[in-house]
């Protein structure tokens, strides 16, 4: 779920995902378009699975 995804990001990057990634790229937060980089692709995959 979204909470677990956020905790995984926080554990891996040591960053607060809400502030760091909410409006990042095309897929982190309210997304659309094509992934910009590896981080944005991770959000894209999450959207495909849980969106």
From Swiss-Prot:
Any one GO MF annotation of this record: calcium-dependent phospholipase A2 activity
Gene Ontology BP term (one): phospholipid metabolic process
EC number(s) on file: 3.1.1.4
Cellular component GO terms, alphabetical: extracellular region
Short name of one Pfam family: Phospholip_A2_1
Cofactor(s) it depends on: Ca(2+)
Amino-acid positions noted as binding Ca(2+) in the UniProt annotation, renumbered to this chain: 27, 29, 31, 47
Main enzyme class: hydrolase
SS bonds (residue pairs): 28-43
Signal peptide: none
Metal-binding among keywords: yes
Catalytic reaction(s) noted: a 1,2-diacyl-sn-glycero-3-phosphocholine + H2O = a 1-acyl-sn-glycero-3-phosphocholine + a fatty acid + H(+)
Keywords: Calcium, Disulfide bond, Hemostasis impairing toxin, Hydrolase, Lipid degradation, Lipid metabolism, Metal-binding, Secreted, Toxin
Cell location: Secreted
Tissue specificity note: Expressed by the venom gland.
Active site, UniProt feature: 46
Free-text comment on the cofactor: Binds 1 Ca(2+) ion.
Described purpose of this protein according to its UniProt entry: Snake venom phospholipase A2 (PLA2) that impairs hemostasis. PLA2 catalyzes the calcium-dependent hydrolysis of the 2-acyl groups in 3-sn-phosphoglycerides.
Family per similarity comment: Belongs to the phospholipase A2 family. Group II subfamily. D49 sub-subfamily.
Entry protein name: Basic phospholipase A2 Bfon11
Source organism: Bothrops fonsecai
């Amino acid at each position: 779920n979204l909470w677990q995804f956020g905790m995984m990001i926080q554990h891996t990057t040591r960053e607060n995902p809400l502030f760091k990634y909410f409006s990042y790229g095309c897929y982190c937060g309210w997304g659309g378009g094509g992934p910009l980089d590896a981080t944005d692709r991770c959000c894209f995959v999450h959207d495909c699975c849980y969106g």
